[in-house]
């Protein structure tokens, strides 16, 4: 048995301590984890410095921001765990009840998933978020961090286990796979005897590898090639504010805008205003400017590189924005449906017909009217922290909170009935 299999077995053995715990016991465990995380801040920051040193010069600045931890972010991680503790416990919720003509009483009841596996890349906060959500939803969790964030993840898990050791929940219910190589991931993908669910969080390559190779049930958290369409009837003040936030708020995350579509009837006047905001305005403020990848029409109005063949299919996760002009809302929708990833897409318009057409025909997990796509987030949606953004339709779609990490079963109460 490999080390990875041993860790999977430990998680499976420990799941009973989680799925038999009541809400009060789980909440005590989460609060102890949060306190322990803050108490271990110096150890976690020291580990994070090792990750940052190893990554120096190898990843862009926007990706370094995803990897970076500081005291404020550790406090935010701890507060995220406390927020999960404050949420209602989904386990045991009665979803439906019915009584059949023969007197059988049927109850549909929400239950824990069992053991949840998470394969993720260079975001240390995923470690604590995933552990908190899994435990509150009644499941053990097996974490496999990317190499970039492994030292940080190891220190975070050590702190979480220290907190759990003070409660009745077995600390082995949280496992961090030590093998950060490809084999560690593939063992998890094949671990159908141990894992009830596997969730990948990361770039397109990671997600594709998991979806194509896993024999464990997978919830796909797709990449975010996020679009915003500025309609000819848009309020320009709203549009500029929304685009600025959606692109520059935190470009390294999956709900950040990557493609801007602008109605050709306003492009000549709107795009220069946008350029002043995203390029000159940010340079004057000492901030990184946005770099444009432009289709031929957009290139007539603002400066930037000519868009390459793949620029409208790329999740840049950087201060880069692909810009294209379109003749109508119908053309915008056609482009998004052909090139998007069904994550989050938005329209800015004061035209109700255009908004209704857009929301009806865009088949994405979150569709926005006159708002930044940066709101696609478990915390912003009132779910607490999230396990990821699902872009598939089966079981879960959009931000995955506690309810999305559970299943259900039927309890059938009889008085001796038999089927004739």
UniProtKB/Swiss-Prot annotation:
It is found in: Cytoplasm. Belongs to the gamma-glutamyl phosphate reductase family. GO terms for cellular component: cytoplasm. It comes from the Bacteria. The lineage of its organism: Bacteria, Pseudomonadati, Pseudomonadota, Betaproteobacteria, Neisseriales. Pfam families: Aldedh. Its main location: cytoplasm. InterPro entries: Ald_DH/histidinol_DH, Ald_DH_C, Ald_DH_N, Aldehyde_DH_dom, G-glutamylP_reductase_CS, Glu-5-SA_DH, GPR_dom. The keyword Amino-acid biosynthesis applies. One of its GO terms (biological process) is L-proline biosynthetic process. NCBIfam families: PRK00197.1 (NF001221), proA (TIGR00407). Pathway: Amino-acid biosynthesis; L-proline biosynthesis; L-glutamate 5-semialdehyde from L-glutamate: step 2/2. Keywords: Amino-acid biosynthesis, Cytoplasm, NADP, Oxidoreductase, Proline biosynthesis. This is Gamma-glutamyl phosphate reductase. PANTHER family: DELTA-1-PYRROLINE-5-CARBOXYLATE SYNTHASE, GLUTAMATE SEMIALDEHYDE DEHYDROGENASE. Its EC number is 1.2.1.41. It catalyses: L-glutamate 5-semialdehyde + phosphate + NADP(+) = L-glutamyl 5-phosphate + NADPH + H(+).
């Amino acid at each position: 048995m490999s080390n990875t299999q041993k860790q999977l077995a430990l998680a499976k053995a420990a799941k009973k301590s989680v799925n038999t715990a009541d809400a009060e016991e789980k909440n005590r465990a989460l609060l102890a984890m949060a306190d322990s995380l803050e108490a271990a801040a110096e150890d976690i920051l020291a580990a994070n410095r090792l990750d940052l040193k190893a990554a120096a010069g190898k990843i862009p600045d926007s990706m370094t921001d995803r990897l970076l931890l500081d005291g404020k972010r550790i406090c935010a991680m701890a507060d995220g765990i406390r927020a999960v503790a404050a949420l209602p416990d989904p386990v045991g919720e009665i979803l439906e009840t019915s009584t059949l003509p023969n007197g059988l009483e049927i109850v549909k009841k929400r239950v824990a998933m069992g053991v949840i596996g998470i394969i993720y890349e260079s975001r240390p906060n995923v470690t604590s978020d995933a552990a908190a959500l899994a435990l509150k939803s009644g499941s053990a969790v097996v974490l496999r961090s990317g190499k970039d964030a492994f030292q940080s993840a190891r220190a975070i898990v050590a702190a979480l286990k220290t907190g759990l050791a003070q409660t009745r929940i077995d600390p082995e219910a949280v496992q961090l796979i030590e093998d950060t190589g490809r084999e560690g991931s593939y063992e998890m993908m094949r671990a159908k005897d141990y894992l009830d669910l596997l969730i990948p969080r990361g770039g397109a390559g990671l997600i594709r590898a998991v979806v194509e190779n896993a024999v464990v049930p997978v919830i796909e958290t797709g990449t975010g090639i996020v679009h915003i369409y500025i309609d000819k009837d848009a309020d320009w003040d709203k549009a500029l504010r929304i685009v600025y936030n959606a692109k520059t708020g935190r470009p390294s995350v999956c709900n950040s805008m990557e493609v801007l579509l602008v109605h050709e009837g306003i492009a000549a006047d709107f795009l220069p205003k946008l350029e002043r905001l995203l390029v000159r305005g940010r340079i004057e403020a000492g901030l990184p400017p946005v770099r444009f990848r432009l289709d031929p029409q957009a290139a007539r109005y603002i400066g930037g590189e000519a868009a390459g063949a793949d620029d409208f299919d790329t999740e840049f996760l950087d201060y880069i924005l692909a810009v294209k002009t379109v003749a109508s809302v119908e053309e915008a929708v056609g482009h998004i449906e052909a090139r998007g990833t069904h994550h989050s897409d938005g329209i800015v318009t004061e035209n109700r017909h255009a908004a209704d057409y857009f929301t009806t025909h865009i088949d994405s997990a979150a569709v926005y009217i006159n708002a930044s796509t940066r709101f696609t987030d478990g915390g912003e949606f009132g779910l607490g922290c999230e396990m990821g953004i699902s872009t598939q339709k089966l079981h879960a779609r959009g931000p995955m909170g506690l309810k999305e990490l559970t299943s259900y079963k039927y309890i059938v109460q009889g008085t001796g009935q038999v089927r004739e």
